[in-house]
Amino acid sequence: MPPDWDTDSPELRQNLAGLLESIKQDARQRKQPTVETARRWQSEIMRNLQADDPKYVGAFRGETGSEDVQVHVNWIFDVAAPEVGDALGEFEQRLKSAVAYLDNFVPPGAEPNADQIAVIIDVCAWAHAEWVRIHPFANGNGRTARLWANSLAMRYGLPPFVGLRPRPKGGYELAGEKAMRGDWAPTAAAFRQMLDEFQNELGPAT
């Protein structure tokens, strides 16, 4: 039997590793981000895993078969299923606007400076936190949110500093709870720390 879709299994880690490599290529080409991109990510994350119900794979809440799916994080409830479609539309519009600005602010192939990194981190944090707030899938929202953050980071010359599995520690969990309430500032603070730790582990460039 395939491992459960929530289990930290070798199959899940393999799916995430392969997906991150694909996302890296898309990021380098600066492909236009869409919510359909994340739908594909969630489907690939769940490949060869046992879902509670197969209809939840690759489906946004509120769509056929998921009309009544409601989820919460520590009893903080997310966007209601009938409102997910509109929330995703607004998310995509705002993300495209942010990316259009950053595409000009950070030239392709350039190493971002401190001011640029600050803006990149903010956009990564906003996208991650807003995805967590909407919680568009029945499962896999945290993983896809972290993929959004890494996709944007790699698009602008930063490493994929947000761990995919296991879930990051430190202030990440509390930041997620704040994100459910619409506050993405704690996520930005957690991401700045993660990036510093990631770069410290790599050591100085030679």
Explain the meaning of each model-derived region.
Residues 1-139, 143-206:
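FIC/Doc superfamily catalytic core
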